[in-house]
């Protein structure tokens, strides 16, 4: 496998150290820390829970418990990290804070934002990740991340692809900053039967 090592060495020399890596028998594999979902079954399915420094998408049918799962995850995170905050970007304006408090969410270490359009939701999410104070963020939900142009436009305006472009840009912006952080970011989404 010396040819593999030579290729990696050559590319790293040309493009910068760490540009490409291989994990042969003699190389340590980097372990990604995990945060519990609050469910042993789901933790096992995810290889130990939500991967830290990664973006996740939790998808399911309407009212199947996606927000409840994320609330349980935030509660578990608060138990493990008393010095960190958790947050929800409640685009749906439907988060029941009183119910979450009864479930065990410490509202003194909880932030909520109810942005009026998608770009603002993404900007707030990015700022929370970059702050280093928030370790678990939920965006509820992708389906309601409506671009500002769509909100301000007429019903007849052609807005095809605006949300797809918004999410594409969001992933480009968020992937790098989340990857360099100690934050878990979960986007909630739902299946649609008809378009």
List where the protein language model places each region.
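The Walker A/P-loop phosphate-binding site
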Residues: 2-113, 122-130
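Short amphipathic alpha-helices and their capping/turn segments at secondary-structure boundaries
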Residues: 124-137, 174
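Short, ordered loop/turn segments at secondary-structure junctions
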Residues: 26, 91-93, 115-117, 141-144, ...
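A conditional alpha-helix N-cap/helix-loop micro-motif detector
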Residues: 35-39, 67, 118, 160, ...
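Short coil/turn segments at beta-strand junctions that form active-site/ligand-binding loops
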Residues: 84, 133, 183
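Conserved P-loop NTPase nucleotide-binding/switch module
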Residues: 136-183, 187-195
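Switch/connector loops and helix/strand junctions flanking conserved nucleotide-binding motifs
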Residues: 95-99, 120-122, 145-149, 194-195
């Amino acid at each position: 496998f010396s040819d593999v090592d030579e290729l990696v060495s050559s590319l790293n020399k040309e493009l910068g150290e760490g540009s490409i890596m291989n994990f042969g028998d003699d190389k340590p594999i980097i372990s990604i820390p995990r945060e519990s979902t609050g469910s042993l079954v789901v933790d096992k399915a995810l290889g130990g829970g939500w991967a830290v420094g990664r973006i996740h998408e939790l998808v399911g049918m309407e009212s199947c418990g996606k927000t409840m799962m994320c609330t349980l995850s935030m509660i578990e995170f608060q138990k493990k990290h008393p010095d960190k905050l958790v947050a929800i970007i409640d685009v749906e304006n439907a988060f029941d804070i009183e119910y979450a408090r009864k479930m065990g969410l410490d509202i003194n270490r909880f932030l909520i934002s109810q942005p009026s359009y998608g770009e603002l939701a993404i900007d707030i999410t990015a700022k929370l990740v970059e702050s280093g104070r928030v370790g678990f963020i939920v965006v509820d939900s992708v389906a309601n991340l409506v671009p500002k142009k769509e909100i301000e436009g007429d019903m007849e305006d052609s807005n095809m692809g605006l949300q797809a472009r918004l999410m594409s840009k969001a992933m480009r912006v968020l992937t790098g900053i989340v990857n360099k952080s100690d934050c878990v970011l979960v986007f909630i989404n739902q299946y649609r039967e008809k378009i």
